[in-house]
Amino acid sequence: MKFAAIDIGSNAIRLLIEESVIKSKKDFYFKKIALTRVPLRLGKDVFVNGFVGDNTISKLVKSFKAFQLLMDINDVNHCRACATSAMREASNSEFICKLLLEETGINLEIISGKEEARLIFSNFHLSSLDSNYNYIFIDVGGGSTELSL
């Protein structure tokens, strides 16, 4: 199976496509197929004006359409699209989510800072960490910082 993740941050949007490689029921991994980054600065609009401007929305829709084509070409089975700090703060975020769904069929979730930290933490294999130590995971983004202990 192939999976895609779309990350809408304050300074860029990213598409990651990975394929699950299954050796056995307990032995599998994900192989990166593609990673695309578009330097679209939603935070520049939101943190100054409180909303995402029309020009930036237009570029966001075009980027999502391009991402949709890349997912189709790569036969992606499942996609999750998440937006973080800038979209949490944008007064027109609900409008943007509806527009993206109508234009591309992609459902954009605006996730909380807590969910963002949980997703980052879930990428680490705890079994590979030394249990004699404590760890802190820090994500410094363009509009927020998340900590996981």
Regions found by a protein language model. Give the residues of each.
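Nucleotide/phosphate-binding catalytic cleft detector across ATP-hydrolyzing
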Residues: 1-10, 16-137, 148-149
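Acidic, divalent-metal-coordinating active-site segment for phosphoryl/phosphodiester hydrolysis
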Residues: 142-146
